[in-house]
C-alpha cells in the first residue's frame, strides 16, 4: 500500500492522465472516505474524488453525455469524478457528498477560481433537512449492514458513528450559528 506522501505525487499524475484520456480539465480533486475522515486502516484504499469540466462545445451539444468518470477499482485506487454540470445540480439539491468533498482536508488539485465561486454557494444551498435525512439513513444502513453480526470490525463502528455525529453537529452547531446570524442581522445592537 502506498503512503499518503507517495499518493501526493501519484494522484496528480493520475489526474493528468485522466485529463488527457477524457479531454477534460480537473477543477478540484480531493481524498474522500476513511483517510479524509482520519480513521483509515493499513489496508484502506485511496478514494480520490474530483470535479471536472469539458470544453465549451461539449455543453452546447444536444446529445446526452455521461456525467461521471469512474476508473476501475483496485487495492490502492478508487477514483471517480463528476462533471461540473452534475456537481452544480447536486450542490443546488444540497447533496451531502459534494458538501463533504468541499470540506476534505486532503486536496490534491484545485482551480482557485472554481473554489472561489463554489464555496459561497455552499451556505446558500445547504439544507439541514436534506442533510439530516441523508446522515440518519446512512447511520441506519451502516448499523443494519455492519453492526448486526457476532464479529464486527472496529472501523465499522466509526462508519456508523460518523453520520450520527454529523447529525448532532448539524443540529447543534449549524442551526445555532444560523440562529445567531439571524438575530444579529435583525438587531445590530446585539453586535455592539
What are these regions (language model features)?
Residues 52-58, 94-97, 141, 166:
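Short loop/turn segments at secondary-structure transitions that flank enzyme active sites
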Residues 33-72, 77:
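Catalytic metal-binding acidic patch
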Residues 28-31, 100, 170-172, 176-177:
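A structural signal for short, well-ordered beta-strand segments and their strand-loop junctions
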Residues 27, 46, 158:
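Residue-level detector of short, conserved catalytic/binding motifs and their immediate flanks
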Residues 61-138:
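A basic- and aromatic-enriched beta-loop-alpha substructure that forms the phosphate/nucleotide-
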Residues 119-192:
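Conserved nucleotidyltransferase catalytic core and NTase-mimicking acidic/glycine-rich helix/loop elements
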Residues 1-30:
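Helical scaffold of the NTase/Pol beta-like nucleotidyltransferase catalytic core
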Amino acid at each position: 500500500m502506498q503512503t499518503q506522501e507517495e499518493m501526493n505525487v501519484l494522484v496528480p499524475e493520475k489526474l493528468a492522465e485522466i485529463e488527457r484520456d477524457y479531454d477534460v480539465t480537473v477543477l478540484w480533486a480531493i481524498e474522500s472516505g476513511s483517510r479524509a475522515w482520519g480513521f483509515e486502516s493499513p489496508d484502506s484504499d485511496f478514494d480520490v474524488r474530483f470535479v471536472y469540466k469539458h470544453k465549451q462545445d461539449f455543453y452546447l451539444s444536444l446529445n446526452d453525455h455521461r456525467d461521471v468518470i469512474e476508473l476501475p477499482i483496485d487495492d490502492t485506487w478508487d477514483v471517480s469524478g463528476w462533471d461540473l454540470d452534475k456537481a452544480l445540480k447536486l450542490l443546488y439539491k444540497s447533496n451531502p457528498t459534494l458538501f463533504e468533498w468541499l470540506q476534505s482536508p486532503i486536496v490534491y488539485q484545485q482551480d482557485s477560481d472554481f473554489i472561489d465561486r463554489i464555496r459561497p454557494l455552499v451556505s446558500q444551498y445547504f439544507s439541514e433537512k436534506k442533510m439530516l435525512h441523508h446522515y440518519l439513513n446512512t447511520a441506519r444502513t451502516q448499523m443494519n449492514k455492519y453492526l448486526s453480526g457476532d464479529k464486527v470490525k472496529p472501523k465499522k463502528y466509526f462508519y456508523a458513528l460518523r453520520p450520527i455525529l454529523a447529525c448532532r453537529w448539524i443540529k447543534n452547531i449549524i442551526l445555532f450559528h444560523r440562529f445567531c446570524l439571524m438575530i444579529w442581522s435583525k438587531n445590530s445592537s446585539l453586535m455592539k
